[in-house]
């Protein structure tokens, strides 16, 4: 099986990490995998030597030049599967396959069958209904949903049940174990022994950090030495910083921005908080649980498929700072319970959310789709 993977993002977020884990994992089980990535992107920078890498930067979803370049590569490489990992990737894959097959219905002079298009769906948003979106998603042979919550949304959008398959995302447990811990108290000059509540997410509206800051305002009234470290960058940085100032939390809430040592920072957290309004699955939750950290998270999207309430963490409604603050306070004041939840989270991730399981299930999707196509 030969799969060609497409991710057009320049930034590094959970989705790009999943792409890299998938591609490397497929190669480890003996499959051929190549990657189309943005030439200036963080994903391309992190690719290991030996991987077939094709730089491509579509300017728009219907970038004819990018589509033409990719169509020529399809004719030369003749992959069995094109796995598009983001919406722009779906568009360029659909365009390139259409250009490559033309009126012959094949991608090669010998009449090779055109590749199947697999589309990963990692966000719990509905598919857009404009004409371009309808066209590109009609070209998809199978959707891979990162959670059952996303799969249900795809079915609501009219995707046939046999063309939407859930494959929960996974993490590399060995990589997590190998990450050196970061002493957050020294790094960010936090008071000695101050409990640290951490969040890792882009500063964008649906991640809900504004509600986390509101919760922090309530938490420090009950736990005055508590500190909050929010890792990530995004369009809402100015808004969140202003909110911190309005609540007079400058000594309690820190926004260090994007860091490459995220796993080490998570190991320095006493508690992991996720404030998302919507969430496909939440791979940062998996990282935190793999680091044996108890969780306080919202019930958004696929999060309840990860966090076992009362066992690995506590779940609260989205957009509810009061409930989030109460859950954070409860766990900060219960060292034993917090430790037990962290241990249970580690066991849950080790059993259900490994990269090996994710790769095996992804390979099975490829085999099924390729084997059943006319």
Predicted regions mapped to residue ranges:
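Conserved acidic donor-binding segment of nucleotide-sugar-dependent glycosyltransferases
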Residues: 309-310, 314-321, 330-335
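N-terminal strand-loop element at the rim of the active site
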Residues: 5-65, 235
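Aromatic "clamp/platform" in nucleotide-sugar-dependent glycosyltransferases that forms part
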Residues: 258, 277
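A conserved, positively charged/aromatic
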Residues: 115-146
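A short, active-site helix/loop in glycosyltransferases that binds the activated sugar's phosphate group
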Residues: 140-166, 171-175
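A short helix/loop element that forms part of the nucleotide-sugar donor recognition site in Leloir-type
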Residues: 176-191, 346
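A conserved mid-protein helix/loop that constitutes part of the nucleotide-sugar donor-binding site
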Residues: 13-24, 195, 199-221, 228, ...
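Short hydrophobic beta-strand element within catalytic cores of glycosyltransferases
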Residues: 35-37, 294-297, 307
């Amino acid at each position: 099986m030969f799969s060609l993977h497409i991710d057009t993002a320049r930034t590094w977020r959970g989705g790009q990490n999943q792409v890299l884990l998938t591609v490397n994992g497929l190669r480890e089980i003996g499959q051929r995998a190549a990657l189309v990535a943005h030439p200036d992107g963080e994903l391309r920078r992190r690719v290991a030597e030996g991987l077939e890498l094709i730089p491509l930067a579509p300017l728009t979803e219907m970038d004819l030049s990018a589509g033409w370049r990719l169509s020529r590569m399809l004719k030369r490489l003749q992959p069995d599967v094109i796995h598009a990992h983001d919406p722009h990737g779906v568009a360029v894959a659909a365009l390139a396959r259409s250009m490559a097959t033309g009126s012959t219905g094949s991608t090669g002079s010998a009449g090779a069958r055109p590749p199947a298009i697999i589309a990963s769906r990692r966000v719990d948003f509905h598919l857009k209904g404009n004409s371009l979106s309808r066209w590109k998603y009609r070209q998809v042979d199978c959707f891979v949903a990162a959670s059952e919550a996303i799969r249900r949304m795809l079915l609501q959008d009219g995707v046939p049940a046999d063309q939407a398959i859930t494959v929960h995302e996974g993490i590399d447990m060995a990589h997590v174990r190998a990450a050196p811990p970061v002493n957050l108290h020294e790094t960010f000059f936090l008071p000695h022994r101050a409990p640290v509540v951490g969040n890792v997410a882009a500063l964008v509206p649906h991640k809900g950090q504004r509600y986390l800051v509101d919760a922090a305002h309530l938490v420090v009234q009950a736990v005055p030495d508590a500190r909050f470290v929010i890792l990530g960058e995004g369009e809402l940085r100015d808004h969140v910083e202003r909110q911190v100032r309005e609540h007079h939390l400058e000594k309690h809430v820190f926004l260090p921005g994007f860091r490459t040592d995220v796993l080490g920072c998570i190991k320095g957290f006493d508690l992991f908080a996720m404030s998302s309004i919507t969430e496909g699955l939440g791979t940062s939750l998996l990282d935190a649980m793999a680091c044996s950290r108890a969780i306080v998270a919202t019930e958004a999207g696929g999060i309840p498929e990860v966090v076992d309430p009362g066992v690995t963490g506590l779940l609260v409604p989205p957009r509810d700072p009061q409930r989030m603050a109460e859950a954070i306070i409860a766990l900060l004041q219960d060292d034993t319970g917090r430790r037990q939840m962290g241990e249970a989270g580690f066991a849950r991730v080790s059993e259900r959310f490994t990269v090996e399981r994710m790769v095996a299930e992804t390979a099975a999707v490829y085999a099924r789709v390729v084997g059943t196509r006319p």
